[in-house]
């Protein structure tokens, strides 16, 4: 990671640039997959799953017995952690429920706002570098609380590597109805258009790679989607009270998502910045996805800024997906943040 010392505001735009690849090259191939699945259903879907996922098993969803068998392989410690996380997520989203708005704006004119559940939703869970069972929880639990009539889940598997037990455990815990072994653009196409084996859904929720994101964008003409997802990113805003090893761990937690991820830290001194840089190098050498992390860190930065006010201005310009505030008075800082996806104090 490079260290940038007190950059002039004229340099900020360049520091805010993301490493977003040009997806024009993949659009044609994704469009062909979408069109083929739309026209030929299971025949096309089976071909793509065999070609890309290396899975030659049935297109039918897993049976209850298969789900139970896979889920039973989760260790008691991990199972307890998943249950605890599920409880916390459910508490938060239950608090988001609100009563109808019902108001008479003038005599005889009644206006009502009412939230109704989407009937059938499709969840896509990536299965590449790590089993993202947390994504199962964060998508399936709100769907259950909202009252969606049916939740189906798609995640890739291969003949040699079945669906991770943690994903099956989380899906079973959350009451997911059907689980399909399919990944990539072909999974998005199947849920968007429906096939003989896969039902068409009314909305797709799907983090994923460039191919999944492009497929969602094309599918949005036919069914609702959550939003296009870019590469994961984090900005850690720290003052002298923050521990350099903690900052490094937070940076790497996003950098390991993929080679296009970006991790940025704002430090209060050059000494702290160099300590963070050293810790990042030390920790990354211990992690299994070192090549992907190295690619991510090649377009990441540690920025030294001389005041908290300047740092806040930069954060609001950068508008990070994930913002971690590691300062003495984090709530006071958070109150001044106007552009960030999720904020952690």
Regions from the PLM with identified roles:
Residues 1-7, 178-183, 302-307:
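Short acidic-hydrophobic, aromatic-tinged amphipathic segments that line or gate anion-handling sites
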Residues 103-169:
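Conserved small-residue-rich beta-alpha loop and adjacent elements
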């Amino acid at each position: 990671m490079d260290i940038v010392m007190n950059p002039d505001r004229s340099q900020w735009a360049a520091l805010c640039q993301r490493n977003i690849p040009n997806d024009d090259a993949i659009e044609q191939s994704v469009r062909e997959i979408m069109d083929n699945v739309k026209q030929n259903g299971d025949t096309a879907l089976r071909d793509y799953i065999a070609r890309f996922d290396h899975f030659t098993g049935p297109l039918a969803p897993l049976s209850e017995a298969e789900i139970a068998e896979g889920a039973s392989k989760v260790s008691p410690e991990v199972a307890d952690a998943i249950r605890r996380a599920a409880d916390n997520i459910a508490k938060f989203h239950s608090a988001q429920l609100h009563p109808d708005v019902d108001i008479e704006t003038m005599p005889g004119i009644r206006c009502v706002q009412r939230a109704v559940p989407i009937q059938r939703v499709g969840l896509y869970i990536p299965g590449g570098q790590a089993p993202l069972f947390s994504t199962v929880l964060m998508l399936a639990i709100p769907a259950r609380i909202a009252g969606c009539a049916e939740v189906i889940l798609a995640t890739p598997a291969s003949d040699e590597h079945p669906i991770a037990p943690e994903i099956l455990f989380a899906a079973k815990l959350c009451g997911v109805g059907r689980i399909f072994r399919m990944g990539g653009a072909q999974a998005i196409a199947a849920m968007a258009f429906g096939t003989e084996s896969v039902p068409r859904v009314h909305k797709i929720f799907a983090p994923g790679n460039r191919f999944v994101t492009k497929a969602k964008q094309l599918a949005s003409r036919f069914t609702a989607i959550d939003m296009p997802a870019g590469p994961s990113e984090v900005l850690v805003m720290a003052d002298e009270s923050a521990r350099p090893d903690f900052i490094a761990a937070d940076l790497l937690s996003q950098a390991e998502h993929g080679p296009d991820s970006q991790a940025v830290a704002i430090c209060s001194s050059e000494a702290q910045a160099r300590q963070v840089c050293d810790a990042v190098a030390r920790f990354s050498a211990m992690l299994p996805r070192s090549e992907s992390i190295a690619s991510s860190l090649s377009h990441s930065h540690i920025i030294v800024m001389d005041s908290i006010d300047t740092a806040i201005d930069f954060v609001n310009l950068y508008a990070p997906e994930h913002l971690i505030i590691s300062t003495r008075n984090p709530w006071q800082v958070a109150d001044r943040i106007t552009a960030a996806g999720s904020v952690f104090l």
